[in-house]
């Protein structure tokens, strides 16, 4: 397995093309505090040759000052960047790292283990394709391990790598490993995971992380990195119809008018019939314009300007969809919330709701139930406290274009924003759409430029506002 290739070896242009054409897997690491999440990512970066000699020297120096591994190198320090994290030996913020092999590129989010930082963990999970849930082999499953498994399930992540870490500290006991796996499978049975791959490893020593370990002769499957290289990136659950929220109208002169944005899902080509929500106007794609020239087809994750064959009135907040799979317009939503604000959420609360580039006023009509993070079972509730997960009904001041989250993670998710502080208060997943019979209004700017919260970056940027990132 070739892990690292120098651009000098075959030319910078070829090197860049190779990496641009690779599949990208987004995954998160989560679990209880001190389960070794940051150490695992640091080991992946080190053993895939992603760090330079001067970084290794700095790591050795920092390990002596801040490390938690005695006199040995502490790979967690490659990821824990905040001073508070290094002083406490824990992860607080969400840290993103990038690395690649000859097979695939990776974006990994190291998420906090402490319960008071669980809301930070939702930031990393909101865009991930896969979750690596770490469990300390000495302690087994914890309340926070179960909570994270429930959360990644609620956020639509269907593939899980169950990394049983610190196996060296239990003598690579097969019985201990199988007991943890059995307990996790029993808890996760109702969570609708399509795959749970259990891997025994030692992030500190590197066994079964990048290369196979030799201590556990009873384990004959692949190490973690090989699994991450081979797992399907786009599962059936992520296949979705074309959706592009309009970020701005591109009109440099009277001869050109296009709608610019990031394609949230699906793909589109010239000639495709599209519908613009909320106006309901239809047209066809005339051109797909980019800074590098026109495209024959554009897909999820690409930033493009769509030129339509007809003059269609639309502005920021509109959503362009293929006509064979239009969005639903509604002013009432049943939403599953991950509540992140310190104050309780109660019926009558008035917030901003942001879906893509749409921002509207939202009132909490009712709080229906709270999800128990230990069991995953729902019970009646009339309020939600910080870090609670529950189901509510929102009433909006006008219709917006949405999908159920089960059909589209991008246009089916939202954030709620405190109107007074502009802090992000919750992550929401659209469960049920209550279609309205009233006529959809013409698209307008959501709020004034000076007042609109989380103006760019969508769901992830809005969540990161919680932490000043």
Swiss-Prot record:
Its EC number is 2.7.7.4. Residues 202-204 are annotated as: G5. PROSITE patterns: G_TR_1, G_TR_2. Residues 110-113 are annotated as: G3. Residues 22-237 form the tr-type G domain. It catalyses: sulfate + ATP + H(+) = adenosine 5'-phosphosulfate + diphosphate. Residues 31-38 are annotated as: G1. GO terms for biological process: hydrogen sulfide biosynthetic process; sulfate assimilation. It holds the Pfam family GTP_EFTU. Residues 165-168 are annotated as: G4. One of its GO terms (molecular function) is sulfate adenylyltransferase (ATP) activity. Residues 89-93 are annotated as: G2. SUPFAM superfamilies: EF-Tu/eEF-1alpha/eIF2-gamma C-terminal domain, P-loop containing nucleoside triphosphate hydrolases, Translation proteins. Keywords: ATP-binding, GTP-binding, Nucleotide-binding, Nucleotidyltransferase, Transferase. The keyword Transmembrane helix does not apply. Pathway: Sulfur metabolism; hydrogen sulfide biosynthesis; sulfite from sulfate: step 1/3. Belongs to the TRAFAC class translation factor GTPase superfamily. Classic translation factor GTPase family. CysN/NodQ subfamily. With CysD forms the ATP sulfurylase (ATPS) that catalyzes the adenylation of sulfate producing adenosine 5'-phosphosulfate (APS) and diphosphate, the first enzymatic step in sulfur assimilation pathway. APS synthesis involves the formation of a high-energy phosphoric-sulfuric acid anhydride bond driven by GTP hydrolysis by CysN coupled to ATP hydrolysis by CysD. HAMAP family: Sulf_adenylyltr_sub1. NCBIfam families: CysN, PRK05124.1. Heterodimer composed of CysD, the smaller subunit, and CysN. This is Sulfate adenylyltransferase subunit 1. It comes from Methylorubrum extorquens (strain CM4 / NCIMB 13688). The gene is cysN.
